[in-house]
């Protein structure tokens, strides 16, 4: 039974990292594209746009880090194994 739980944990860890990276990856690409477009339209507010972009990218990246934490806990601190 432990081998089934271990195999399921590895699969779940891979899915956790993969799925946790899809959403923020799409969001970061969209945010960067819109920031570049905004800077091209109004170059005088580049500093404000860049600061807001970096802050929002950090928040989006935290979602991926949460997925990594879940994956690492499934691999190394799995509560379901005996």
Curated annotation (Swiss-Prot):
Instruction: Return the InterPro entries for the record.
Output: ATP_synth_csu_bac/chlpt, ATP_synth_F0_csu, ATP_synth_F0_csu_DDCD_BS, ATP_synth_F0_csu_sf, ATPase_proteolipid_c-like_dom, F/V-ATP_Csub_sf
Report if keyword Protein transport is assigned.
Answer: no
Topology in membrane: Multi-pass membrane protein
User: In chain numbering, where does the site feature Reversibly protonated during proton transport fall?
Assistant: 61
Subcellular location field? Plastid, Chloroplast thylakoid membrane
Chief subcellular location equals plastid
Which segments cross the bilayer?
A: 4-24, 57-77
Keywords of the record: ATP synthesis, CF(0), Chloroplast, Hydrogen ion transport, Ion transport, Lipid-binding, Membrane, Plastid, Thylakoid, Transmembrane, Transmembrane helix, Transport
Q: Thylakoid: is it a keyword of this entry? A: yes
Taxonomic superkingdom: Eukaryota
Q: Assembly and partners?
A: F-type ATPases have 2 components, F(1) - the catalytic core - and F(0) - the membrane proton channel. F(1) has five subunits: alpha(3), beta(3), gamma(1), delta(1), epsilon(1). F(0) has four main subunits: a(1), b(1), b'(1) and c(10-14). The alpha and beta chains form an alternating ring which encloses part of the gamma chain. F(1) is attached to F(0) by a central stalk formed by the gamma and epsilon chains, while a peripheral stalk is formed by the delta, b and b' chains.
According to its UniProt entry, the function of this protein is described as: F(1)F(0) ATP synthase produces ATP from ADP in the presence of a proton or sodium gradient. F-type ATPases consist of two structural domains, F(1) containing the extramembraneous catalytic core and F(0) containing the membrane proton channel, linked together by a central stalk and a peripheral stalk. During catalysis, ATP synthesis in the catalytic domain of F(1) is coupled via a rotary mechanism of the central stalk subunits to proton translocation. Key component of the F(0) channel; it plays a direct role in translocation across the membrane. A homomeric c-ring of between 10-14 subunits forms the central stalk rotor element with the F(1) delta and epsilon subunits.
Q: Which family does it belong to?
A: Belongs to the ATPase C chain family.
* NCBIfam families named in the record: ATP_synt_c, PRK07354.1
* Cited PANTHER family: ATP SYNTHASE LIPID-BINDING PROTEIN, MITOCHONDRIAL, ATPASE PROTEIN 9
* Additional remark text: In plastids the F-type ATPase is also known as CF(1)CF(0).
UniProt protein name:
ATP synthase subunit c, chloroplastic
Which species is listed as the source? Antithamnion sp. (Red alga)
**Phylogenetic lineage:** Eukaryota, Rhodophyta, Florideophyceae, Rhodymeniophycidae, Ceramiales
């Amino acid at each position: 039974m432990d081998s089934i739980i271990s195999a399921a944990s590895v699969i779940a860890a891979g899915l956790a990292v993969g799925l946790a990276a899809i959403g923020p990856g799409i969001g970061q690409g969209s945010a960067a594209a819109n920031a570049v477009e905004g800077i091209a339209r109004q170059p005088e507010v580049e500093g404000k746009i860049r600061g807001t972009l970096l802050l929002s990218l950090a928040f989006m990246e935290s979602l991926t880090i949460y997925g990594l934490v879940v994956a690492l806990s499934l691999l190394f601190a799995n509560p379901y194994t005996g």
